[in-house]
């Protein structure tokens, strides 16, 4: 009963307000009796929209943080790679200079010691360096060439020493007054031993 009176009172009050509005402000939309419920619904929708907007902002901030972190890591890797590439290119240039000095025979003692160490750890360096395939192949070719030239130079020196010794031996023989027959000491080649005539040689052969 009270609910019905309340609804009636609301309706009457709404009618009075609508009448006043139509007189004072013609064209203004009339107020509906259930306007309070509509306001409540609109308030709930506003709160829901606000919550969704806040969540969206939080997600965006989180994504921005992830993007910044990822960009920072990428930049750090690029700087590290650039530094490594620079060191490797400097190393390659140094090896090329050493190769040139090796071919020209102008290696210093310091360069020679460095080459010996370089050849020993050649395989380890090639595995640890993060080079492009072309640069790695170039380094390996240079080091193999240096090793080959070093071995070839040592073999050439030994061969020269052997040829010199043979030449010296022949010159010593030619410089002697006469060459003794090793079968008959005291005789020169072509002479028969004492007590052995040509006839005896013939009879022994028969």
UniProtKB/Swiss-Prot annotation:
Organism listed in the record: Saccharomyces cerevisiae (strain YJM789)
Acidic residues compositional bias, start-end: 197-206
Main location per the UniProt record: nucleus
Modified residues (Phosphoserine): 197, 202-203
Protein name: Regulator of rDNA transcription 14
A cellular component annotation (GO) from this entry: nucleolus
Annotated localization: Nucleus, Nucleolus
Residue numbers spanned by region Disordered: 178-206
